[in-house]
Amino acid sequence: METFDAHDVVYLLMPDRWADGTHDDPEKKRAMFEGMADDRWNPAFDHTTETDGVMARHTRHGGDLAGMTAHLDYLQDLGVTTVWPTPLMENDNDRYSYHGYTITDYYRVDPRFGTLDDYCHFVTKAHEMGLKVILDMVVHHCSAQSFLYADKVDSAWFSTDERQIVTNFRPYAQSDPYLSDYDKQQLTDGCFFITSAAFNGCNAQVQDYVIQNGLWWVEMTGANGIRLDSYPYNHFEAMNRWCMAMKAERPGMNIVGETFMSSPVAVSYWQQDSPVGDRQSLLPSVMDFPLNDILQTALDEETDDWETGLTRVQKYLGDDRIYAHPDHLMTFLSNHDINRFVKTWDEGHNNLRYKQALTLLLTIRGIPQLYYGDEVCMSGCSDRYDWGQRQNFPGGFPGDETNAFEQRGLSERQREYYEFTRLLLNWRREPAVNRIIAEGRFIHHVVSNGIYVYARELEGKMITVMLNGTWEEHTLETAPYADVMPADSALEVITQRRISIGETLTMNQRDIFILDWT
């Protein structure tokens, strides 16, 4: 099985907020929702009013597998190579079920998204178009309305009979050498929401159940890899057993765990072969939340040569020895649990901030992941209900005046974001370029005069990136960069013009050069 790795660019989407592919068949749409605990859907709630605002946050908007399948061509043309939908398993809860993370039936596609056949068709169609699919799974907890909890035969399947224990939301607890056993247990045994129930991960039957379920979904759908939700909340040895079982049945299949922590030491602890672990994890890939923390703020700063702006990026990458396999880190600007990279529409006017961040994401080490709408300047901040960063994708729902799928009605700013994203993604996908970035060694220079210079090199072929992190024009002497400037001219990827390399090179404010020497 072909899996996902640093050669790929992953596109994360929330099916309910992506596209409604059944809106032109109202009878079928009603049937998909009929009999569900939450049988409402409306993509057009006015979230600015108090009543509709709450409804918009809680209620489904009607996106489905048919919509996902119908717009695979958009993703292929954009230039991504892998699709990661949030969970599609049944979430038959009274409210707040659209996100997919409180599962009621682990062996059923939520009928409001479609059927198992629809899911398999989506994966098959993606494969035909050269796209891979990541399966999103939740093994720490299920819905409190699941028959597994509500009708449980054996209470030992769950951490507690009553749901009084709430997790302490301290995912670093298991890697902290000094933390009390009480705090560690509260992390693993506590539920996330009042609507969920935490599995007893130490129970062998529970382990068998979630292992068999993972194998079943991979076998049935043909997915290329797995993303595991809330990985550090699970019992360490139980997850090792889970990973071992997946690898035995699907050798080489990548598994990435959500490691939502700002400490690189805490994140590294969960990756296979970690140099900081006191026990051996079997998880191949982890999520680079520490880098995301830096990117969210560093590109708002004026870069100096010691502490701020791009210097923070350079210094963080310089600490990569903390990770056993830096190339297996999933890197990202936004996702469904945090602020979008563009937090407000007004902030989005600074398109150079996004362009520099995307350039970094697509050319440094790791497995880059985009969040739906990044490419058209979707903005929003996380709030209590996570509404801000989970809006509808423009063009996915009836009545949308803006249609990003068809490039209709986009503002000048949205179009500029889209064209830049598409340009870089399709360039990165070119076979020769792709190998250099995914497999090549990484070389960087210290930031000088606010300019960060780094390169990827493989088998004598090189790509060099230069970023001006200041709002001033700078002229730099090229002699110190001879190791990453191997010829007297190069193709600049963004402008598609050749640049002659003399004794000096001038960069405008917040400028970007991507120099292809191949």
Label the model's feature ranges:
Residues 2-9, 14-221, 239-250, 265-266, ...:
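Substrate-binding/active-site clefts of carbohydrate-active enzymes
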Residues 3-6, 21-56, 60, 261, ...:
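Loop/helix patches that line or flank the sugar-binding groove of alpha-linked glycan CAZymes
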Residues 9, 501-518:
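C-terminal beta-strand-rich structural cap/linker in extracellular carbohydrate-active enzymes
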Residues 9-11, 83-85, 133-135, 226, ...:
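Hydrophobic faces of well-ordered beta-strands that scaffold small-molecule active sites
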Residues 14-17, 89, 107-113, 139-141, ...:
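Short, flexible loop/turn elements at secondary-structure junctions
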Residues 60-67, 114-118, 205-210, 234, ...:
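Soluble or luminal CAZymes and related metallo-dependent hydrolases
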Residues 123-131, 141, 146-149, 213-215, ...:
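Active-site-proximal helices and loops of the catalytic beta/alpha 8
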Residues 480-496:
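Solvent-exposed beta-hairpin/edge-strand motifs
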